[in-house]
């Protein structure tokens, strides 16, 4: 059953940020004591893909893609932020992902003892659960938050084209060789050139796109986004604390797999949580262009069905 929430009174007063003066990094407050930073990602063109000898076949061909400006959260969503949504008693808990609901409780600790304080990144959620959090943010703030597209994520990771060598990556992220078998607090490592933390390593990050091995060959050149299909595979990016440093590339694409939820004993398996996906989290983006309420709601309906 759909749950209808009242819209914030300032919703109709929201204006579109269009000028250089307005397009700046800001702090999004979601509670008197909780906020997160949204970093400006400028419009531009870049080469999507990789010509590295370590690249997989789905990282080719190199293509020039043009993107509109957007904001991206400077770090992965943390438990401090997620728990405001998860504990929002105005929302019903439901096994189905419909309307606006909050995630059902985990039947076991899906951090597997790695840590759950406010600065740890939230982990083990499905892509749809991450999108529901984005919808909750929209209802709470009036701003259109969503998961990044693959192209947006890769563009932000490359940050103007300055690639980090595997040897230098230990200063920027946690991976198999330096993570001690667990994920860590956000922002413990250096940010990339655009001020984004943990883009490579710590947790893999959901994008909004359906995984297509031919993505780089088939997507359009401007602001590409794929239409959702089956639950599997969807695309994650960035690598995690479990991945070797050689897998931490901005162009590396990670298709989700039913094995990420293999040990879930529930019938049917949870649509919110991934018992074996302890390595995946997410961060949010906000397009500069604020669409109408009707278009935004249709967007959420499409990607949450």
Predicted regions and their residues:
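Surface-exposed recognition segments
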Residues: 54-65, 180-182, 203-305
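Short, well-ordered junction/capping motifs at the entry into regular secondary structure
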Residues: 171-200, 228-230
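Active-site microenvironments of metalloenzymes and redox enzymes
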Residues: 48-54, 66-168, 209-216, 286-305
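Positively charged n-region of N-terminal signal peptides that target proteins for export
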Residues: 1-5
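Mature N-terminal segment immediately following signal peptide/propeptide cleavage
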Residues: 34-47
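Structural recognition of the beta-strand scaffold that forms the well-ordered cores
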Residues: 39-40, 123-124, 146-148, 164, ...
């Amino acid at each position: 059953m759909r749950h209808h929430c009242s819209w914030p009174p300032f919703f109709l007063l929201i204006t579109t940020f269009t000028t250089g003066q307005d397009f700046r990094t800001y702090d999004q407050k979601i509670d008197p004591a909780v906020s997160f930073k949204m970093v400006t990602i400028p419009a531009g063109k870049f080469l999507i893909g990789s010509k590295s000898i370590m690249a997989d076949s789905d990282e080719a061909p190199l293509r020039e893609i043009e993107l509109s400006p957007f904001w991206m959260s400077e770090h992965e969503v943390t438990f401090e932020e997620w728990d405001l949504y998860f504990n929002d008693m105005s929302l019903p808990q439901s096994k189905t992902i419909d309307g606006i609901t909050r995630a059902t409780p985990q039947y076991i600790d899906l951090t597997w003892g790695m840590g759950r304080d406010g600065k740890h990144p939230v982990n083990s959620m499905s892509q749809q659960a991450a999108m529901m959090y984005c919808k909750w943010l929209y209802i709470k703030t009036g701003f259109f938050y969503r998961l990044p597209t693959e192209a947006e994520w890769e563009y932000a990771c490359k940050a103007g084209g300055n690639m980090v060598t595997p040897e230098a990556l230990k200063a920027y992220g946690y991976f198999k060789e330096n993570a001690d078998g667990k994920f860590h607090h956000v922002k413990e490592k250096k940010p990339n050139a655009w001020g984004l933390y943990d883009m490579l390593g710590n947790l893999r990050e959901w994008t909004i796109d359906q995984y297509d091995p031919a993505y780089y060959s088939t997507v359009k050149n401007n602001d590409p986004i794929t239409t959702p299909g089956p639950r599997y595979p969807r695309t994650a990016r960035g690598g995690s604390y479990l991945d070797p440093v050689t897998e931490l590339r901005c162009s590396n694409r990670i298709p989700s797999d039913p094995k990420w939820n293999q040990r879930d004993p529930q019938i049917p398996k949870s649509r919110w949580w991934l018992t074996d996906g302890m390595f995946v989290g997410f961060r949010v983006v906000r397009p500069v262009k604020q669409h109408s309420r009707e278009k935004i709601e249709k967007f959420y309906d499409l990607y949450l069905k």
